């Protein structure tokens, strides 16, 4: 890799750390190509990415912004998982790590400054995704309106039933 390619990789990593809500750091030692491909396809379904990175390039891209604790994440054979939704990548990687002992969770970076340990990444994976939170929020917003509409329609329905009862009584 020549100097221009390294600089290009550093810029790409900077944009990853800036744009991704959370970056999950893993050790992938011993994983086969088929296992990596399966993990990547699972992540791709959720609009996330799994990328093997060079530690020195990551440390230059982060430029010391996360301190020594963050630099300690990037030792050995490291791959990062990231996506537009901070929770989805953590969820998929955590689930895959349970199924495959070769993939080890090391930690993560939330935002650009907060370093997460393995337990924090597992806790992040238990949170609902952004789409699930939006769905719950919309449900909470719509519920009162639906109840109000039901309450407002109830007297009209009762009146219609009373009139129908009188009509059937008079017809009989």
UniProtKB/Swiss-Prot annotation:
Keyword Ribosomal protein attached: yes
Gene that encodes it: rplJ
Please list the GO terms describing molecular function: large ribosomal subunit rRNA binding; structural constituent of ribosome
What family does the Swiss-Prot or TrEMBL record give for this protein? Belongs to the universal ribosomal protein uL10 family.
Please report the organism this UniProt entry assigns to the protein: Caulobacter sp. (strain K31)
Biological process terms from the Gene Ontology for this record are: translation
Where does the source fall among the domains of life? Answer: Bacteria
Which UniProt keyword terms apply here?
Ribonucleoprotein, Ribosomal protein, RNA-binding, rRNA-binding
How it assembles, according to the record, is:
Part of the ribosomal stalk of the 50S ribosomal subunit. The N-terminus interacts with L11 and the large rRNA to form the base of the stalk. The C-terminus forms an elongated spine to which L12 dimers bind in a sequential fashion forming a multimeric L10(L12)X complex.
Q: Which Pfam families match?
A: Ribosomal_L10 (PF00466)
One GO cellular component, as annotated: large ribosomal subunit
Task: From the Swiss-Prot or TrEMBL record, give the protein name.
Answer: Large ribosomal subunit protein uL10
| SUPFAM superfamilies recorded | Ribosomal protein L10-like
The record ties this protein, via Gene3D superfamilies, to:
3.30.70.1730, 6.10.250.290
Query: What high-level taxonomic lineage is stated for the organism?
Result: Bacteria, Pseudomonadati, Pseudomonadota, Alphaproteobacteria, Caulobacterales
